[in-house]
Every structure is written in C-alpha cells, then in structure tokens.
C-alpha cells in the first residue's frame, strides 16, 4: 500500500493495517504468545526495540503510547498550547529513552487491557483525523507547529506505518519460534 495522501486514504490505511495486525495476532499460537521475544541471535536487528520488547503486550503498549503522543500533540497545539511531538525532557535523539519509560510504565498492564486501550485510542485518532480537511492534513505549512512536514505524515507514522513495524516484529518472533 502506498503512503496515504488524502484523509480517506489515511483512514483506510490505518484501519486496514490495524485489521491486518489483529489478524496476525489472532493467528499466534499459545507457544508464540508465551515465548519471550529474543532477537539476540540476529545481528541485523540492532535497534533498541529489538531488545526492549519481550512480548505482544509490549508491542501493543508501544503503539498505544504513540497514539497518546499524537493525540496530546494535536489537541494541545490546536488549543494554542504549542508543544513538540516528543515531550520534554526527550527529543528526537533521545526518544528511545522515552520508549523505555513507556515499557516500564506498563509492565503490570495485561495483554487484554493493552488491546482494549489500543482499540480505544485508534478510535480517538480516527475521530481527530476526520476533523481535518485534506489540505490541513497533507499540505505543508498549514500549521506552524508541524514544522517542515505535514500533519498527515504524523498520523500515518503513528498508525499505518507503526502497525507495519509491529507486524514485522511479530513475524520475526513467529519465525524464531518455528526454528526452536
């Protein structure tokens, strides 16, 4: 699927990838669900998230927290309270530390709670997307607080693209489980 360039495409991509991800999740075996994620033997998987996330709940919570970042950022800036997407004390160079904080915060959250939280937050994201026009979402310079990008690109990154990331990780875990 190509990167969305309209509100309809954005909503379609977000919901389609979310459904694809949920179909993949529904197909995970008990063994795949109960086996901790371990990508330490794959030298190509160097990014911090390959070590951070240990189970499906961790991935779902990561997606949920990035929805929350997006929702807070859009709402605050629409109200005239200009904040950056990545909240202080973090920035685009240190957001990995923020992701670890999200991970720590949710170690007592159950998988079912995480799934419910993610579904609810996706619904909120879609409702906010619907408030904007195509121009507001996909034209540069409409909102100063977006910087040199488009508002829509943030929505794509926090939804459809992030679900792709999750599916890639889940498929890698499934492959690891099959090898063992």
Stretch-by-stretch model annotation:
Residues 1-2, 43-47, 98-106:
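A short small-residue
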Residues 2, 9, 13, 51, ...:
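Short, contiguous, pocket-lining structural segments
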Residues 13-16, 20, 113-124, 161, ...:
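A non-catalytic, amphipathic alpha-helix used as a structural packing/dimerization or gating element
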Residues 27-46:
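Short secondary-structure junction/hinge motifs that connect adjacent elements
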Residues 40-97, 131, 136-180:
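Short, contiguous alpha-helical
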